[in-house]
Swiss-Prot record:
Keyword Secreted carried by entry: yes
Keywords per UniProt: Amidation, Neuropeptide, Secreted
GO CC, one annotated term: extracellular region
Family of this protein: Belongs to the periviscerokinin family.
Protein name, UniProt field: CAPA-Periviscerokinin-2
Known function: Mediates visceral muscle contractile activity (myotropic activity).
PTM annotation (Valine amide): residues: 19
GO biological process per UniProt: neuropeptide signaling pathway
Keyword Glycoprotein appears in the UniProt entry: no
Lineage top rank: taxon: Eukaryota
Organism: Mantophasma kudubergense
Subcellular location: Secreted
Amino acid sequence: SGLQFAVLDGQGFLPFSRV
C-alpha cells in the first residue's frame, strides 16, 4: 500500500499511507 487516505487494501483498511 502507499496511499494518503483510508482505502481498502489487500490486507484490509489502512488508516493512512505506510509505504
